[in-house]
Amino acid sequence: SGLYEYLSVTKLEPEDQIDVLDFSLADIMTRGSTTVFEQGWCDEKSIEHMGESGLRTIVGPVASSSNFMTKDGRNVYYNMHEQQAYDRLQYVMDTRQKYDGAYDGRMTVALYLGQVDCCTPEYLDEVRRVMDNDGEMIVTIHAAQSINEYEQIARTYGKTPAGYLYDHGIVGSRVHYGHYLMPQGHSMNAMKLMKPDEELKLIAGTNTNIIHCPWSFGRRGMILESLQHYLDLGINMGIGTDTFTQDIIWEMRYAAIFCKIAEGANPFTGTAAEVFNMATLGGARAIGRPDLGRIQKGCKADIVIVDLNNLDCQPVRDPIKVLVYSACGKNVDKVIVDGKLIVDGNRPVNMDIDKVIGRMQQAQDKMIAKVPERDWAGRSADEMSPMSFRVVD
């Protein structure tokens, strides 16, 4: 699968990290996001680079007990590194001391736990103790994003991912579950560990947030079933981009469309207003920032100006519906963060976008060349992901 096979081979060379980060930041800001939540290794050089970008940034250094991989393309294996998790947890706390609130208050430091199946009970208990001592820290973890992961938690602990995390205190208004795509009742999940909806009600009842990334899974044929159901249960939902293209407008559109498909072609579900609120108020609520996600006295001047005077968006009656169903990131004209212009005319103010694109292509070329030595079967990139058409010399 893409999760277990592609991630292990798509590694960047150290010298390319900042160039690719530049590309990603340019992509995000020019397509209409004002706040980015970066989850990964997050060394100091990368953190400072993000702080200097002008975006409002949440950095989440990863600290997990293990990482998953496959040796045969059929089974998932775990490389345990429990002590590294505790060392990384201390790194997160040290990083919070140094960078949380930096860059004129635009930077927040969070904790990224990786995936639920990569965290032991003992480690989660320690994380809960840290959370109790630091009530402001945001904690994010991927959960219920694959059947392999779901079954691993069920086999090992006799719990759903939500139940397992609840038992160890990884819940609350500052906790994000990435995706939570396949709870019981999903067409791809036949397990019955809890009563219908008990799993999702547990998330709603603890005010835990779910971050929905529709395109990341939808392009592989997997969708939430359904977004409307999650909203109706009272779960706070945010929207993330998760993968290229990092277009928040595109993500709103797919969230709305996939919801209607899951609801049996009901056009009154997953409305433009609901997905717009997810991308603005829902995200702000998830990070504990009532001063974001709205234009209101006392709120931060984080503003996106979208040009609707074009063939994509005309004619206009309801600008929110036009934004969700007709516009795209290329229609973003200006982006303002904390009152400062960072995108003008759909181009970053402080980046040479042509150089950024060229360096990104070079980084990809180097990465592709090393795919065979990183793949469990020694396959090339073209074997793992065939070209759409045969390439003729």
Which residues make up each language-model segment?
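Alpha-helical scaffold segments that flank or form the walls of functional sites
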Residues: 1-55, 87-104, 361-366
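Divalent metal-coordination and catalytic microenvironments
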Residues: 32, 50, 111, 142, ...
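Metal-coordinating catalytic core of metallo-dependent amide/deamination hydrolases
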Residues: 48-189
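Glycine-enriched alpha-helix->loop->beta-strand junction motifs that scaffold or abut catalytic
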Residues: 54-56, 131-136, 170-173, 202-211, ...
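Histidine/acidic-residue-rich catalytic or RNA/ligand-binding cores of hydrolases
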Residues: 147-159, 185-200, 221-230, 245-261, ...
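His/Asp/Glu-enriched, well-ordered alpha-helical/loop segment
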Residues: 166-174, 225-310, 326-328
